[in-house]
Amino acid sequence: MIMTPPRKLHIKSYGCQMNVYDAQRMVDTLAPEGFVETADPAEADLVILNTCHIREKASEKVFSELGRLRVIKEEAARTGREMKIAVAGCVAQAEGAEITRRASTVDVVVGPQSYHNLPKLLAKARDGAPAIETEFPIEDKFSALPAPKPAAIRARGVSAFVTVQEGCDKFCTFCVVPYTRGMEVSRPVADIVADAKRLAENGVRELTLIGQNVNAYHGDDENGRTSSLGRLLHRLAMLPGIARLRYSTSHPRDVDDSLIEAHRDIPAVMPFVHLPVQSGSDRILAAMNRKHTAADYIRTIERFRKVRPEIAFSSDFIVGFPGESEQDFADTLALVTQIGYAGAYSFKYSPRPGTPAADMQETDTALAVPAAVMDERLAQLQALIDAQQASFNRAAIGRTVEVLFERAAREPGQIVGRTAYLQPAHVMASPDIIGKVLPVTIDSLERYSLKGRLASEETAVASLRSTQRESETFA
């Protein structure tokens, strides 16, 4: 019997956690078609660019990468090997047929809601004409994407993403997500629980629930009642084997009582929340259509801290939004100083075509913040954020913290895991600790990574008792 050699697949993903998750599901979708992953695009039979449309010149970066892939594709053709190129993700959704017009080497253009149709699109592309699908049948995507095989789950490690929600209804004036991912749609509770159970049965210990606006989750449960994210977390915490639960990314407006209570009542929900605010200026927040004030955001932070004092936060910030004044920027610095973040991401404003903010700046060019001013503000903000992150990390030295060990580190004999706050932590230990949550005494800090040693049994018990007493005090 002659065995057909597997076809090789290379996926390059840009941007958010949702794209990482989507890349895995594309791998699962194409596995029955005989595709296996490769890290080398030069040996791939299919290359997929899984794109992001959030940042400046996203489309141009894609076309630049397509130029490099064209050379690889032509070289493959000279050796008698056919190579297909697909563009997926939010640039595919936004640009559509324009991609194949500008880059004739592209065979498939597929939006985020149509990945389950990849085999059909590839078959269509074999006829010579490019296959393009950028519709919005998002319910079909959730129901039609195949579940990963047990071997694939185990190979991906002890932490996994689970999509619970997709799309956004907020229409922030700077953002393209509602136009590229569509309106908010939530998966049924039963489907999410089934996915999580399958992951747990195959060695996953930590689940991160993801969505463009994850705390807007409003899926139906088995009784037809609408479930909040907080109630969903309660359901997932009951699954055997799941030690940690996270979620990302959240909108301050959608933090409700049930989510606060989940942080109070469920030890598995990690005390680390990514809660983007974008600006500390009420004037800029209004121009962004965020529908909350800086004071609203601070009150939300305080609600979390009241029920879980050890909780920490990260955030996103945009500097140089159209019309941002020195006072507006000073308000942002003041908010960052008041909150005290464990980390944050800051970016210069970049106009996204078709968004209200881009139109606003185009209509009134005086609103545009000069590039040099944006650079200066970004450097100042990032320096403050970096100092806060360094201080937060240094505070771990000398403490015993719980670490979920994920994999072997680059240095021989070391195993790396993550703390409750997603800090990498390295110890010298046997690989058999991978998948376990163990107490680690932190001895030092190297850049953003903690280094320590497995705590002695006596230290571990004392640490866990201390944590338990704190939990009882805060309940």
Curated annotation (Swiss-Prot):
Q: Name one GO molecular function term.
A: N6-isopentenyladenosine methylthiotransferase activity
**Cofactor binding note of this UniProt entry:** Binds 2 [4Fe-4S] clusters. One cluster is coordinated with 3 cysteines and an exchangeable S-adenosyl-L-methionine.
User: What is the protein's name according to its record?
Assistant: tRNA-2-methylthio-N(6)-dimethylallyladenosine synthase
Q: Which domain of life is it from?
A: Bacteria
Asked whether the UniProt record includes 4Fe-4S among its keywords, one would answer yes
Organism from which the protein derives: Afipia carboxidovorans (strain ATCC 49405 / DSM 1227 / KCTC 32145 / OM5)
Q: Which residues form the MTTase N-terminal domain?
A: 7-127
Where is this chain's protein located in or outside the cell? Cytoplasm
> Sorted alphabetically, which keywords does the UniProt record give?
4Fe-4S, Cytoplasm, Iron, Iron-sulfur, Metal-binding, S-adenosyl-L-methionine, Transferase, tRNA processing
